[in-house]
Regions:
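Beta1/beta-strand and adjacent pyrophosphate-binding region of the FAD-binding site
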Residues: 2-17
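Conserved N-terminal glycine-rich FAD pyrophosphate-binding loop of Rossmann-like flavoproteins
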Residues: 6, 39-63
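Glycine-rich FAD pyrophosphate-binding loop
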Residues: 10, 26-49
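Short glycine/serine/threonine-rich phosphate/pyrophosphate-binding segments
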Residues: 18-22, 151
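Hydrophobic anchor at the start of a short beta-strand
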Residues: 32-34, 79, 147
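A short alpha-helix-loop-beta-strand transition element characteristic
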Residues: 43-47, 64, 69-71, 75-88
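Short beta-strand to alpha-helix junction loop
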Residues: 63, 83-103, 113, 154
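Predominantly flavin-linked oxidoreductase catalytic cores and closely associated redox partners
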Residues: 104-154
Length: 154
């Protein structure tokens, strides 16, 4: 019988949304075991290329821009608005932001597994989810009480 890894929460996708979700879980439930599964070889890979490498995070028309500012500020990332109303990190370096967000997530106690593609998700009758994960050619099973899919696009 295969060994099953158990987590309070699993997040599929280590992009900006997945990492932000993981940080938020740890903020409100510091003792929770959180796993982020990413099929690519690097977390926040697309984030590192956004906004021509400057990382356009939001804009003035965003309904909840205070929430966006608050999240980034709490995680040590200061934003600025350009003349067109777009928000960027003060560093204007998307790669630096991707690295910082990944480091903050790991520092918070979140486990990030790269090269880990989720092949199947099954809801358990008693609650929670079983995930079949292919990781570097081997299959493993993960059980999570809660599941968030933040897989993004192709």
């Amino acid at each position: 019988m295969k060994q099953i890894s158990n987590y309070d929460a699993a997040i599929i996708g280590a992009g900006a949304s997945g990492l932000a979700a993981a940080l938020t879980v740890k903020k409100y439930k510091p003792g929770a075991s959180v796993l982020v599964l990413e099929k690519k070889e690097r977390a926040a890979k697309k984030l590192a290329a956004t906004g021509n490498g400057r990382c356009n995070l939001s804009n003035e028309a965003c309904e909840n821009k205070d929430v966006v500012f608050g999240f980034f500020s709490e995680n040590g990332i200061m934003l600025r608005k350009d003349e067109s109303g777009r928000f960027y990190p003060c560093s204007e370096d998307a790669g630096q932001l991707a690295s910082l967000l990944t480091e903050e997530t790991v520092s918070a106690g979140v486990r990030i597994r790269l090269d880990s593609e989720v092949k199947k998700v099954e809801a358990c009758p008693e609650g929670g989810f079983l995930l079949l994960v292919e990781e570097k050619g081997a299959e493993r099973t993960v059980y999570a009480k809660k599941l968030l899919i933040a897989a993004g696009g192709k």
